């Protein structure tokens, strides 16, 4: 029994997708601090732009950390039905916008899909914080103001990371699997890997896969600062703050955004004449089991 378990664990560490079903990327969408959409994002990268700025969404006058990479010039309300705008965390419109662009880029119109086709399309997202800023905001109403009736009844759904994939599934009417992976900084990569595996094993034909996060709130900022992982040296020069490969690096910078791929079974993509960006041939995953 132990031998079989070790063999299974070794397979999980490096999965080369030995199934005859190949997995390819046919669509991409993103919302980032240096551009909305993949073309604007790529242009920002080519120009060497920085998306790090002084935080404006809440008071940072008493915080040692005053900067973050915030999404700019994004129409948050356009992504949601008016009745839903006050009931979902900031991560939901970020994910919706990226998913819409990814579908459009892949040449897939969700509104034209048959019920059978919608059963074959799933969602797999990665997130670290999910809806924590939304939860923090509304718990503050409870604990500080006492006006309980003003707190959202959606605090608990927002606190559940699964809300993110559910919102995408509902928005596009997708009836395939709908999961969220939360493994810290590797969440999005893990989500893409597991989504590809579902296609490789024949469980789904198409997957929306990627990640979204918007961890910008006073409590979260303070928590990361307590870990001493955020830079505090570049508050006056935010564009110089993110410098992981320099000798004078002093910590990371929090940011928000989303990136979502359309993953598709290779032969299906070929048959419909889809453009193919790349193939996912396999993935590796381990744990150092070292420290907190």
Model feature map: region roles:
Residues 36, 134-138, 192, 217-223, ...:
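Short acidic, glycine/serine/threonine-rich loops at helix termini
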Residues 2-25, 112-118:
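Flexible, low-complexity linker/loop segments at domain and module junctions
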Residues 95-108, 161-164, 169-172, 178-213, ...:
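Active-site-proximal alpha-helical scaffold in enzymes
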Residues 203-250, 283-292:
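Acyl-CoA/ACP chain-elongation machinery
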């Amino acid at each position: 029994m132990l031998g079989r378990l070790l063999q299974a664990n070794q397979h999980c560490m490096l999965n080369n997708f030995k199934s005859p079903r190949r997995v390819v990327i046919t669509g991409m969408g993103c919302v980032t601090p240096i551009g909305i959409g993949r073309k604007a994002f790529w242009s920002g990268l080519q120009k060497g732009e920085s998306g790090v700025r002084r935080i404006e969404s809440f008071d940072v006058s008493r915080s040692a950390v005053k900067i973050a990479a915030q999404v700019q010039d994004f129409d948050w309300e356009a992504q949601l039905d008016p009745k839903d705008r006050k009931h979902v965390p900031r991560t939901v419109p970020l994910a919706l916008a990226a998913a819409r662009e990814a579908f459009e880029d892949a040449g897939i119109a969700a509104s034209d899909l048959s019920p059978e086709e919608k059963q074959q399309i799933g969602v797999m997202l990665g997130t670290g914080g999910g809806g924590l800023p939304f939860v923090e905001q509304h718990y503050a109403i409870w604990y500080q103001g006492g006006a309980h009736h003003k707190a959202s009844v959606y605090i608990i759904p927002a606190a559940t990371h699964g809300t993110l994939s559910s919102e995408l599934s509902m928005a596009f009417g997708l009836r395939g699997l709908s999961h969220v992976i939360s493994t810290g900084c590797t969440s999005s990569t893990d989500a893409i890997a597991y989504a590809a595996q579902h296609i490789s094993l024949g469980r789904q034909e198409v997957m929306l896969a990627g990640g979204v996060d918007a961890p910008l709130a006073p409590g979260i900022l303070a928590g990361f600062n307590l870990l001493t992982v955020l830079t505090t040296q570049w508050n006056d020069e935010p564009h110089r703050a993110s410098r992981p490969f320099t000798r004078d690096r002093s910590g990371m910078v929090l940011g928000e955004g989303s990136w979502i791929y359309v993953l598709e079974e290779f032969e299906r993509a070929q048959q419909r004449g889809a453009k193919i960006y790349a193939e996912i041939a396999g993935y590796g995953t381990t744990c150092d089991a070292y420290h907190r």
